[in-house]
Amino acid sequence: MSHALPIAAIATAPGRGGIGVVRVSGPRLDAYIRALLGRDLTPRHAHYLPFLAEDGERIDEGIAIYFQGPHSYTGEDVLELQGHGGPAVLKRLLARCLEAGRSLGMRLAEPGEFTRRAFLNDRMDLAQAEAVADLIEASSEAAARGAMASLSGEFSQRINDLSGRIVHLRMLVEATLDFPEEEIDFLEKYQARPTLDGLRQDLDTLIAQARQGIILREGLHVVLAGQPNVGKSSLLNALAGDDIAIVTPIAGTTRDKVVQEIFIDGVPLHIVDTAGLRETEDTVESIGIARTWKEIERADLILHLQDATAPGDILDVDITARLPARTPVLAVFNKIDLLTSTAQLAENSIGISAKQGLGLEELRARLLQMAGWNPGAESPWLARERHLHALQAARDHLDIAAEHASHDDRVLDLFAEELRLSHESLSSITGKFTSDDLLGEIFSSFCIGK
C-alpha cells in the first residue's frame, strides 16, 4: 500500500447540485476521522451526521462513508462526505477537511491523483485508469459501454493473455539457448512457430478492434467545404436535425466556422460548416475563407459540396486541386431535387438534396465507411492512439522474430530479444513498463476529484 501524504478534493462536478461529495484518501485515517467528525465510523457503512467547523459551527449535514484500505478506490483509506451540492458549502467543507489534516501533511489533490493512487496501489492497471476518464467523458451510449468494458478489464485481459503467450514462447527460446548439450530443440518440440503465427494473427485482430475503439472514443473531424451557396449550412442542419447554421440565398452568409457534433451508429462526428470558397474583396469574408483552409488542413474527412445543377464548374475544379491529398475527400452534389433529368454524377461521388433530405442515409453510410468504421467488427472497448502504437510495435517485433525463426541458422538471442521487446510494448498498455512522464500526461487530463 502507498505511504503517500493524504489528499482531499471535491469529487463532484463544479456548479450547484442536490448532492456534493468531498473525498479524502491517505494511509491510516482512523485518528483523522475521529478528529474531523468527533466519532469513529464503521467501515463501509453510511453514517448520517453533522459536519462541523473547528469551532463547532455547523457547516452542513449529510452522510459520511469510510472505506478502509486496501478495499477502496485508491487502495488507501478513503473518506467520502456527501452533503448538499452548493459551491460555497463544499468549499467550506473541503477547507475543514484540509485544516483537520494539517498535522498529517494533507493537501489538495492534483487532477487524477485519486485514480493515479489506485493504479500505483494495484487497484487497476493503466488501461483501466484511462477508462475511468473515458467513461466520464463519454458522449454516447456506445462510448460509455466501451469505456465500461475497458474499466471492467476486458481489454487488459486480452493484453495479458497475449503477453503470457509471448513470455511462454520466450521461455522456450531461452531453454534452447541455455541447454544446447541436451540436443533438444524446444522450439520444434513445443511448436513455437505455430504459436508465433497465432500471436501475430491475434494481434492483427486486436489492432483492428483498437482502430474501431479509437473512432468510437475520439470521433472524426469532418469539414464541409465548397463554393458559397452550394448548401453547406443546409447540410449541417439536415445532419444535425436542427437549425444550427443560418441559411439564406445570399452568398457569403457563413463567415466563420460552425461546429456541431452528431452521432451515426454511436460514432461521434464533429461536423464543421465553413465559409464558402471564392475570390472576394470583402475583408471579413476573406478572413473566414482563410480559416476554412486551416480547417481543411486539419480535417479527418472532407465533404466537397458542389451544385448538382452546375457540374464541372471551374471553381470546383480549382478547389479540388487544392484539397490535401492525404485526406479522404467525398464529392457531394447537392440540389439533385432541382434536376429535370437523371444526371450522371462523377465516379465515387454522391448526390443529395439537403433541403428535401434525399440521399442523406447513403451519405451517413459513406461517412462511416470512409472513416474505417465496421459495425460488424465493433470494438467492445475504447482505445487510444498510444494503445494502437503499442500494439503495432508489438506486432512489428513479432514479424522480426519470425524472420529470425525462419532461418536455418536461427539467431536465437536476437529471436529472444524481439520477443522481449514485443512483450514490453504490450506491457506499456497496462502500465507494467511505463515512464513517469507518460503517467503524468495521462493523469493530468483527469478532473481534480477523480
From Swiss-Prot:
Cofactor(s) listed: K(+)
One GO BP: tRNA methylation
Coiled-coil ranges per UniProt: none
Any one Pfam family match given in the protein's UniProt record, by short name: TrmE_N
Keywords recorded for this protein, A-Z: Cytoplasm, GTP-binding, Hydrolase, Magnesium, Metal-binding, Nucleotide-binding, Potassium, tRNA processing
CDD domains for this protein: trmE (cd04164), TrmE_N (cd14858)
Note describing how the cofactor binds: Binds 1 potassium ion per subunit.
Predominant cellular place of this UniProt entry's protein: cytoplasm
Residues at which GTP binds: 229-234, 248-254, 273-276
Record's subcellular location: Cytoplasm
Enzyme class: hydrolase
GO cellular component annotations of the record: cytosol
Annotated ranges, domain TrmE-type G: 219-372
Residues binding (6S)-5-formyl-5,6,7,8-tetrahydrofolate, per UniProt: R23, E80, R123, K450
UniProt: Mg(2+) binding residues: S233, T254
GO molecular function terms listed in the Swiss-Prot or TrEMBL record: GTP binding; GTPase activity; metal ion binding
Binding of K(+), residues: N229, T248, I250, T253
Family: Belongs to the TRAFAC class TrmE-Era-EngA-EngB-Septin-like GTPase superfamily. TrmE GTPase family.
Assembly and interaction partners: Homodimer. Heterotetramer of two MnmE and two MnmG subunits.
Function description: Exhibits a very high intrinsic GTPase hydrolysis rate. Involved in the addition of a carboxymethylaminomethyl (cmnm) group at the wobble position (U34) of certain tRNAs, forming tRNA-cmnm(5)s(2)U34.
Protein name listed in UniProt: tRNA modification GTPase MnmE
